[in-house]
Design a protein with these regions (language model features):
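Short Gly/Thr/Asp-enriched flexible loops that form oxyanion-binding sites at enzyme active sites
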Residues: 88-111, 258-265
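Accessory alpha-helical/coil subdomains and C-terminal extensions
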Residues: 5, 11-15, 36-44, 164-248, ...
Length: 310
């Protein structure tokens, strides 16, 4: 049986947040999360049961791939009945990718899965890591009066915003406020108090058990359009062996060149069973393929409309 004390499993995949300076060499090294309270003594003030799991060896987030997402899902699924929430410490470069993937892989999720990290190592003087870690743990443990989780979904917490995982993008390589959710408001804002937005938070079906998914098809490419893009580039990309899907980043509200060869290449690809999804290159806004003639040509070629900016 699980104790009444709120319980959080901390999963360290790698990244800047888990680094401390070696006093002898000055080099940054991964610290042992079994000694977490030594490095973040503030956690003692929480009346929580905090356990940790760390990837061995930790990975640079630039090396993140679907196999590691499956590993995270397995860890969460295995421990699902023993913890109230989960905090994943992750490098910032691909954190948004992982958060988005987990939001689909953890079907019927009814507990918080909060990803966070830092721009400065937790062992440096001005680190943002401690605040991010402490707040992420507090959010992961937070419950409503009826005992249900306040935020039962996959999120990213960074600086002072809690954001839906599959709506979040890294926007800055240096600032502490490195992530933003352009097309969906923050689920919580953090200052002196944590101010949740209950009307924006996903409501799970309590009758459905967690349904984990482990398999991803890697045969997907991104086609970013630009003025002057050549037919040879599009042709070679659409004929990659084994290709299953294309995420096509278009102009504005979903517009693309009207050249005959371009539309023909797209149509031939969709007729071969390749899925082509139209998303905008813009940071915010959405695709409206019926708004301009260029968008109508894409629809006729079998391109699928993305309802939101990914």
């Amino acid at each position: 049986m699980r104790a009444e004390t709120p319980s959080v499993l901390l999963i360290y995949t790698g990244g800047t947040i888990g680094m401390i300076e070696n006093p002898e060499t000055g080099a940054l090294e991964n610290f042992n999360f079994d000694h977490l309270l030594k490095h973040v003594p503030e956690l003692k003030r929480f009346n929580y049961r905090i356990s940790s799991y760390q990837f061995n060896p930790p990975i640079d987030s630039s090396d993140m791939e679907p196999a590691y997402w499956a590993k995270l899902v397995k860890i969460i699924n295995y421990n699902y009945d023993y913890f109230d929430g989960f905090v994943i410490l992750h490098g910032t470069d691909t954190m948004a990718y992982t958060a988005s993937a987990l939001s689909f892989m953890l079907e019927n999720l009814s507990k918080p899965v909060i990803l966070t990290g830092s721009q400065l190592p937790i062992g440096t003087l001005r680190t943002d890591g401690k605040e991010n870690l402490i707040t992420a743990i507090e959010i992961a443990a937070a419950k409503n009066p009826d005992g249900t989780a306040i935020v039962p979904e996959v999120c990213i917490f960074f600086e002072n915003h809690l954001m839906r995982g599959n709506r979040t993008t890294k926007i800055n390589a240096e600032n502490f406020n490195a992530f933003r959710s352009f097309n969906y408001p923050p689920l919580a804002r953090v200052g002196i108090h944590i101010k949740y937005e209950p009307n924006l938070i996903r409501k799970p079906d309590p009758t459905k058990p967690l349904k984990p998914h482990y398999l991803f098809d890697n045969n997907v490419v991104i086609l970013t359009l630009f003025p002057g893009i050549q037919e040879s580039i599009v042709t070679s990309l659409l004929h990659v062996p084994g290709l299953k899907a294309v995420v096509m980043k278009t102009f504005g509200s979903g517009n693309a060149p009207q050249k005959e060869w371009f539309i023909r290449q797209l149509k031939e690809a969709t007729e071969r069973g390749i899925i082509i999804v139209n998303i905008t290159q813009c940071a915010s806004g959405a695709v409206e393929m019926g708004r301009y003639e260029t968008g109508m040509h894409l629809l006729e070629a079998g391109v699928i409309l993305s309802l939101i900016h990914i």
